Amino acid sequence: MPIRPANLAARIRPLTALARRNRPADGTPGDPAAAAPEEVAPQEVAPEAAHEEVPEAAYEDAGQEEARHEDVSPEDPRSPYERLGGERSAREEELLGTLPGVVRHREHLAEERRTLLPADRRDGNLAEVSEALRAAGLPHGIVPDRHPRHRLAIRPGDRPAVLEALAAAFAGQAVYADLLEHGRTLTTVLAEQLPGAVALLEYEAPDAPEDSQEGSPEDSHHDEQDGGHDGGHDEEHDAGQDGRPDQRDTTPPEQAGPVWPADRVKGVRIYRPAVIGTLLYGPETGCDLEFWDSAAPSEGAIASIDETPFGWWVPSLEANATTTIGGRPYPLLDVFAASLPEQVDFPIDAVITWVDDSDPAWQERRAAARARLAHTAAPIAEEDGVAESGIAGDADQRFRNRDELRYCLRALAANAPWIRRIHLVTDDQTPHWLDTAHPGLTVVPHRELFAGTDAGPVFNSHAIETRLHLVPDLAEHFLYLNDDVFLGRPLVPEDFFLGNGMPRYFPDNRIIPPGGAESGDSVYVAAQKNTRGALAAAVGKTYPRTLKHSPHPLRRSVLAESAERFAAELHDTVRSPFRSAADLAPVTLAIHYGHATARTVEGHLYDGYFVTDSTEDLARLAQLHDERWADYFCLADGTRDLLSPEEQEQAVTDFLRAYFPAPSPFELRGTAREAADEASDQG
């Protein structure tokens, strides 16, 4: 049954109010049933016992001697997972009243923050872990990975000392540790519980050597298919992988009481949870410590959990090289010191086009352009929307501003912190909340791009796209996106470019009908047909599919070459103030031209497309918020008027505030809108 606007608001608005319900002043837990699900990957974990009476733990405090296997009572009827869950819950209750600024958010204790970005939390977790290891004199080294999360390799034999060091460093703090086996997460404990927790899970094998090669990935990993980051995120590598290594038979003889299967802990993921609004930074921001296995009698070591760029085996874990992450140097395994071919090491910019339809000066310019063209208005296809002016491509929804730019910038700051500079292309407009002095942001007016042409003011995205290669100081590699396209979760440069600089492009499943533009075609379809025909005439390739509404990875040089080669075909598009059936689509042209000339390759990311006047699509936004399954998504204006503009704006604003609660560094602090947001959050 479609969700009507009132019900939709009731579903989305509680997302922004959860902080209030989940954070009572006395620090007691909020109502879990009312909280939004955490943004963590599914885990293969046995049920945990919550808030129950627990026996004396195998350890009393972090930093004490590691629990011994003989301390584990075989008569306890609960599984190790149930015992650890009960012990963790009891300890969380003790900590909750003693840690300022820490609240319970669903299943974690978390710092309550307002401005923290995911990359800052990832880098912060890495810094804390590396410092704890350095202080304990424990060698470690960064392992490059396509996932944004950081990985550290730990030498064979160092696991007990590492567990003790982490427990001591994070004693009495709301810092968590996921216990990792190859291909799955075993369970989650407080970091201060690590030595005893690992001992409890492995108590059936008291005689197993600390770095036993039985069950190592050396034999089992070679036949596994590389899951890779290329097909979109494996949101957590512990969910849904096959190829778990064989486990040795460690059943103790004649043991009384229940016998639980022993699990081998091959790594730990350390993270300090933080919550902003309803957004939890949890294990996806953690730092992975992998307890590598010895390759004896051969030299080197074998990765315990995930493959490396060189496979599972490396000749040495020496880490004399360094790499800089978040402005800090870290030891890097020597074997990875050389630049790898898949690594992107060139700067990447972003270009965003934006318009504010509420600006009176812009409205006057648009009205004047309408008046000049009114007597030559082209017929309008239904799916383009009907403009009051009667001019094709001039429907109001094409220029509607719902403050999407604010959240588009938040998405880039949160999920693509590697962007060097953002270029905002506007028609002499700047939102009041934008920090135009920020060194990572440049505002580019249309008149600067169209200088030297006879084109007047333009309200045509196609015309603007013909001039993007002229943006001053634009990097050779950049992402082009409209302000209604949002990065949905952390991505890496390799999601958009190959290491050799070649952009990836994202074709849609939609097919443009064969043939040239016809009178009944929409402006969009006509422009796509015109583009396809011009390209086919030049390179002999016909592209049936259009492109997704995505961030478009582009090379400035290819865009400029395309503009020059197709200058005659683009002549009228450059000078068309509104979208018309005679236009070409310049970005589509450049991308397909790059592909036809072997300078662009097809890529894949998980995407979402939502039409804001569709009740069904708006209802799906709640699921997107909860699960965060999209690498990017588009909130497109509809033309069917199923919901009023006011209803659409309310639903979209509620969703975007909940999905991107952390301000970007491009927002002025203390603006009226920010104050309104804070007042709304505090209710």
PLM regions and their residue ranges:
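P-loop NTPase catalytic cores that bind/hydrolyze ATP
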Residues: 568-600
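Active-site-proximal specificity loops/subdomain of glycosyltransferases
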Residues: 433-474
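N-terminal anchoring/stem segment of glycosyltransferases
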Residues: 80-150, 156-158, 317-448, 598, ...
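PAPS-dependent sulfotransferase catalytic core
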Residues: 161-170, 608-664
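GT-A fold catalytic core of metal-dependent nucleotide-sugar glycosyltransferases
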Residues: 214, 430, 467-512
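Noncatalytic N-terminal accessory/assembly modules of large enzymes
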Residues: 2-30, 71-209, 246-269
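Long, charge-rich alpha-helical interaction segments
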Residues: 497, 503-577, 581
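Intrinsically disordered, low-complexity repeat/linker tracts enriched for polar/charged residues
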Residues: 37-38, 42-43, 47-51, 55, ...
